[in-house]
Regions:
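Stable alpha-helical elements in mature extracytoplasmic
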Residues: 42, 195, 200-207, 290-294, ...
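Structured segments of extracytoplasmic/periplasmic soluble domains
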Residues: 48-53, 101, 113, 202-214, ...
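Bacterial Sec-dependent N-terminal signal peptides
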Residues: 1-40, 269-272, 279-280, 294
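Active-site-adjacent substructure of cysteine-protease-like catalytic cores
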Residues: 68-93, 292, 296-358
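Surface-exposed patches in mature extracellular/periplasmic domains of secreted proteins
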Residues: 58-61, 213-224, 303-310
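Active-site-adjacent structural segments surrounding the nucleophilic cysteine of cysteine proteases
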Residues: 107, 111-283
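Cys-His-centered catalytic/binding microenvironment captured across papain-like cysteine peptidases
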Residues: 37-73, 77-80, 96, 103-176, ...
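Solvent-exposed loop/turn segments at secondary-structure junctions
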Residues: 93, 104, 206, 214-215, ...
């Protein structure tokens, strides 16, 4: 995906909510039907949840107030099968949203402080609630059944038990870097205006700082001409990187010139290998080109891959990401809103199914998020106009030092479509029905995309 990051600071309406929003429609080949969740059951599940989570645990005095059944706030349309149930907790404070159908994960959102105000709901929260209402109702109409992982969550909550891995937590320490000075000191200026490093370059640099790799570049030269800047940029990757001089945090007046030069050099080199399109209002680059550049110029392993979330089930995707973090490997992650305003950042930890995000904004908004609710309350350099970064998510997997004998992992996708002459292709097909070893047969394909790191 192409990620362009502007310099505008966007403040979002703050919602006191821990991001715990799971994918709402998970497919399975089970023959069982999904069931509606009545308010009585939802209340018991809410009590169980507050009782088993350390940060929300309450005493015997806890009371739950049923404040919203998920109906449309504007039209007040009532329904016998609400999409979700909202409870405020008293007197301790906090609230919880329980799904109205077990096709979705049971706890859509919760907070251990504050309260849920239906009448004064911020517009961004209204949008979230409308989206989840539509998706749950759509799943009902399509007779979608819950996945095994979702059914397990319901069973555990009904028992008042924590998930098997609920206590496991991984958090890797990463630099709190940003896109402005001193990070962009070497980035080109356009008409006298500085350009930000770009979120792609910043994410790469944070990962390389964590790895303290490479010791120096591969020796190759990367040359390209950005269309907006208009002049050729070129870097020969043969200089050592001064990891000991790079600070984890750069505060005004608390660093010297050599420390600024060290991080600015790394940032600029990451930008050039990404073929960054520098611009004063936002610098952008393609993740695939950036990953390719890490291998070619920064001595990272050829087995690195770019994976799309839509290719996996929720359980598979979580397993893939957690395996990386368990191995001590950071994940270069990206997503956009429905306006295709994207951002690249770093996943550096997880707790249950929430992931710790380093947004590349100097520490602003860093914290745990559900991947289905990557919508920080405040944003820094590279923020979008709202709607979070939940669309088109992808991840660079296998970011590690080059290993001898490793090879590229090619990923070729065959697509359906019509040619200009009207011929229909349905991916990779053959008319052969019997396959005999060492006997040739014909396959047919019309459209394909190379999702791999290398060109071929």
């Amino acid at each position: 995906m192409y990620y362009i990051c502007g310099v505008t600071n966007h403040s979002q309406n703050k919602v006191l909510m821990k991001r715990n929003l799971f994918w709402l429609f998970l497919f399975t080949c089970s023959l069982s039907w999904a069931d509606n969740v009545p308010v009585s059951k939802a209340e018991q599940l809410a009590r169980n949840f507050f009782g088993i989570h350390e940060t929300t645990r309450a005493g015997d005095s806890m009371q739950l107030e049923y404040i919203w059944d998920g109906e449309d706030v504007q039209t007040r349309v009532t329904t016998s099968s609400p999409a979700f149930h909202v409870f405020n907790r008293t007197p301790e404070g906090g609230f919880i949203i329980i799904a109205g159908d077990d096709v979705a994960s049971p706890v859509l959102a919760y907070s251990d402080t504050g309260e849920f105000e239906v009448e004064n709901m911020p517009s961004n929260l209204q949008g979230w609630m409308q989206y989840y209402r539509e998706q749950i109702n759509w799943a009902r109409e399509q007779h979608i059944t819950p996945s095994e992982s979702v059914m397990k969550l319901w069973e555990q909550l009904q028992r008042g038990a924590l998930a098997d891995d609920a206590e496991k937590e991984v958090l890797l320490k990463t630099a709190l870097w940003n896109q402005n000075a001193p990070y962009n000191n070497l980035c080109p200026k356009i008409s006298g205006s500085s350009t930000p490093t770009g979120c792609v370059a910043t994410a790469l640099a944070i990962v390389m700082k964590y790895n303290r790799w490479p010791d120096q570049g591969s020796g190759g030269t990367c040359t390209y001409t950005p269309s907006i800047y208009g002049s050729q940029l070129s870097v020969t990757y043969n200089v050592p990187y001064q990891w000991d001089k790079m600070l984890n945090v750069y505060e005004i007046g608390k660093y010297v010139g050599t420390q600024a030069d060290a991080v600015a050099t790394l940032m600029y080199h990451c930008g050039v290998l990404s073929q960054m399109e520098y611009a004063p209002n936002g610098s952008g680059a393609f993740t695939l080109i950036a990953a390719r550049g890490m291998i070619e110029y920064m001595k990272y392993d050829k087995s690195m891959t770019l994976q799309s979330r839509e290719w996996y089930t929720e359980a598979e995707w979580n397993s893939l990401l957690k395996k990386e973090l368990d191995a001590g490997r950071l994940i270069i992650y990206g997503g956009s809103n429905n306006k295709e305003e994207g951002h690249q950042f770093v996943l550096d930890g997880y707790k249950q199914n929430d992931y710790h995000v380093n947004w590349g904004w100097g520490g602003t908004a860093n914290g745990y998020y559900s991947l289905s609710a990557l919508d920080p309350d405040s944003q820094g350099v590279g923020g979008n106009t709202g709607g979070g970064f939940t669309v088109g998510q992808d991840a660079v997997i296998g970011v590690k030092k080059s290993e001898e004998g490793s090879g590229y992992c090619d990923n070729l996708a065959f697509m359906s479509g019509f040619t200009e002459s009207g011929e229909m292709f349905s991916g990779l097909t053959t008319t052969e029905t019997t396959f005999i070893p060492q006997v040739r047969f014909t396959v047919k394909a019309g459209f394909y995309i190379n999702y791999g790191i290398r060109n071929f």
